[in-house]
Structures are given as structure tokens and as C-alpha cells.
Amino acid sequence: MKQFRIRKDDKVVVIAGKDKGKIGKVLKVLPKKDGVLVEKVNMVKRHMRANPYRQQPGGIIEKEMPLDISNVMVMCDACAKATKVGYRYTEDGKKVRFCKKCNEIIG
């Protein structure tokens, strides 16, 4: 299985596409599609039929669609910049992610 440097609840910035420059939180990582769902980014309108069994109303709804994982970059909380992510081990042997710009540990 593929390993991505982006995880759920990471703060990311979109670096390519129609929403370039927008910042959002990762809602879901889709490894089979090489994609991510980012909160309030890549919004589309869908015409939904009402489903009484699920108590779903019909109408036009707005929802997020997946972005390719290569079009987003992790944003460091410490330096507030889009950054590459590296891995290293702490003194107690735990593997952690860190910001390659400021060397701070990422959540």
C-alpha cells in the first residue's frame, strides 16, 4: 500500500488548479485514487433526488470533490508556510514527521 506524507486533519494549501492558494483541512485521504478531500475546496453542485428511507431531502447540494494528492502541500503550523515533509526518529524511537523548512515536528 502507498504511503502518503499527507494525513487526515492536516492543514494543507492547494498549489495547483482552480482553487490554487486556498487553505483547508484534510477530511479524507483516498489512497486508491491518489486523492484527498479538503474542507471547502473543489466544491461542486450536485442535483440529488430525495431518499425517504435515509431521510435525505432532495435538491441542489454543494459538496467537496477529491483533489489529486500532488496538488496539495502540507502547511506547517510553526512557520505558517507550505512545506515538504520529512521523517525522523525521536530519542525514544518513535517515527515523527517534521517540517523541512523550520525542523519543527508536524502534528
From Swiss-Prot:
A Gene Ontology biological process noted in the UniProt record is: translation
List the keywords (alphabetical): Ribonucleoprotein, Ribosomal protein, RNA-binding, rRNA-binding
Under the heading Pfam families, the entry gives: KOW, ribosomal_L24
Q: Which GO cellular component term is one of those annotated?
A: ribonucleoprotein complex
Question: What transmembrane ranges does the database entry give?
Answer: none
Task: Fill in the subunit field for this protein.
Answer: Part of the 50S ribosomal subunit.
The family this protein is said to belong to: Belongs to the universal ribosomal protein uL24 family.
General function of this protein? One of two assembly initiator proteins, it binds directly to the 5'-end of the 23S rRNA, where it nucleates assembly of the 50S subunit. One of the proteins that surrounds the polypeptide exit tunnel on the outside of the subunit.
Q: What protein name does the entry list?
A: Large ribosomal subunit protein uL24
Question: From which organism does this entry originate?
Answer: Nitratidesulfovibrio vulgaris (strain DSM 19637 / Miyazaki F)
